[in-house]
Amino acid sequence: MLTNDWLESFLTHLYIGKNVSPLTLQAYRNDIMQFMEIELNHTADLEKINHLTMRRYLAWLKNKGYSRRSIARKMSATRSFLFFLQKKGCIKSGKWSAVARPKIEKKLPRFLYQHEVLALLEVPDSRTPLGLRDRTLLELIYATGMRVGELVNLNLNSLQLEERLMKVYGKGNKERIVPVGQVASALLEEYLSSVRPVLAAGNKDGRVYEALFLNRWGSPLGDRGVRYNFRKYIQQVSHKDGISPHSLRHSFATHLLEGGADLRVVQELMGHVSISTTQIYTHVTRERLSEVYHAAFPRN
């Protein structure tokens, strides 16, 4: 079997066996193709891949200026592929596994304070259809902590408005049920009754879409559209660097913990597989406590 065939077999294994999302599959494909393009010029025989091969590739990535996080991801994808080949009997040696992956410095998530979130939510002009749509989806991200990718994949049947619940499909297509706050529920009802029908009527291709959020042409609103509009709104209320729609998700978790929510509950709401992913928000709240203390205590 040719190397490209093995790659397709590996990606199929991830998609079917591991339930990996299409976006993650594409990242795996790109990273492994890059490794194959660079290293198979040196080592035409897969069996000859060893720790020197991996070190050479690691050095190449560093020289190209990739960040530690990108290098760690690329090395992880490549190692997973090689482990797959070893399991299939295509390669026997595991010497390549001796090369350590670069350690990633954990960065505290960027979030907005509560007054900043409230200011952001007031920016869209709710008197217009698109403004009310944007106010609704911003409120929904903050009220549920969902990712933008999860938001744009919501369908009409995702909603259980009477129970104020929503079905969300996260990473790996894993389903979770999240509660929806009173304000977000009221906005959703208004959007569904007075805005979505107007947007749907603007569709010219004759198709009927089940997507919850539609663009001005009546088609499903995409990830790029959400991010574009967010940048337009956030620039009016905050000049912090690196603030994105994902910052609303970070704000959701941070504000819950500041309000006394249990860490395990926040983990479930966020859809985190590991509690360690959720624990980073405890560092954020401690930093906030320290900031408030030093600003308010008279003997500082």
Positions of the model-derived regions?
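Conserved catalytic core of the tyrosine transesterase superfamily
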Residues: M1-N300
